[in-house]
A protein has these predicted regions:
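Conserved amphipathic alpha-helix within the SDR
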Residues: 1-13
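Conserved mid-core segment of classical short-chain dehydrogenase/reductases
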Residues: 2, 24-38, 81-84
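A short helix-coil junction within the Rossmann-fold of NAD(P)-dependent oxidoreductases
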Residues: 11-12, 28-29, 54-63
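Conserved hydrophobic beta-strands of the Rossmann-like cofactor-binding core
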Residues: 18-19, 67
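Active-site helix of classical SDR
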Residues: 52, 88
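Residue(s) in the substrate-gating loop at a strand-loop-helix junction
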Residues: 72
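SDR active-site lid
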Residues: 101, 105-172
Length: 214
């Protein structure tokens, strides 16, 4: 990332806006391999850190700049059936908050993008790709409020950046979910358990797949 940033700055000049967008999803819980959890940590968290390290010094020297970091609604609400995705996207949101707090006075502005399902190749490219599974191909748990197009997400992002708005929620329902979670965590957890039961009505629940690690 550092070399890429240096090349772009050399060829085109200072970077005003850096969009940090990479990710993949897996379906596993505590039984997932350490190596897979670590890989997701590298992609969903450390990649944002590497990017910030690469672009912030020059942005600050130039009087400011903008980071658009893609996280996920899972970072605010959790992802049923995927431990690694849930915890790394939560960390990505926290990282964006930290950068905004720490570097705001230096002219750095941050937005964190937290969509649900978007029509991309993230599921097709997943190491757990279940091609032929209708539920998987329809977007899985994240598609409960519909799948939106990348162009729609881009429009929402441009509007948010023009307003210097931190939290970008292309699926408007997520705002209500996060408010309900903050107001009543116990009811929210109960509702998520019931949602999980509905999702896996004819198959084992994710927790039933955990092996004995002792």
């Amino acid at each position: 990332i550092r070399n890429m940033v240096a090349t772009i700055e050399h060829k085109h000049g200072p970077i005003d806006l850096f969009c940090s967008n990479a990710g993949f999803v897996t379906s596993a819980g505590l039984e997932d391999a350490n190596e897979r959890i670590q890989k997701m940590w590298e992609v969903h968290v450390m990649a944002h850190i590497y990017a910030a390290r690469a672009v912030l010094p020059q942005m600050i020297a130039n009087g400011g700049g903008y980071l658009l970091n893609t996280a996920s609604a899972a970072g605010l609400l959790t992802q049923i059936g995927s431990l690694s995705y849930s915890i790394t996207k939560s960390a990505a949101v926290s990282l964006a908050e930290w950068i905004s707090i720490t570097h705001y006075h230096q002219g750095i502005r941050v937005s964190v993008l937290c969509p649900q399902a978007v029509r991309t190749d993230i599921l097709t490219n997943s190491p757990d790709n279940r091609e032929g599974d209708p539920e998987w191909e329809d977007g899985g748990v994240a598609s409960s409020d519909g799948i939106i197009e990348p162009t729609d997400v881009a429009e929402v992002c441009m509007e948010a950046i023009s307003e210097e708005r931190f939290m970008i929620l292309p699926h408007r329902q997520v705002q209500g979910y996060t408010e309900f979670k903050a107001e009543n965590p116990e009811k929210w957890l109960s509702g998520m358990r019931k949602f999980q039961d509905r999702l896996f009505i004819d198959e084992p629940l994710p927790g039933d797949l955990m092996q004995d690690f002792r």
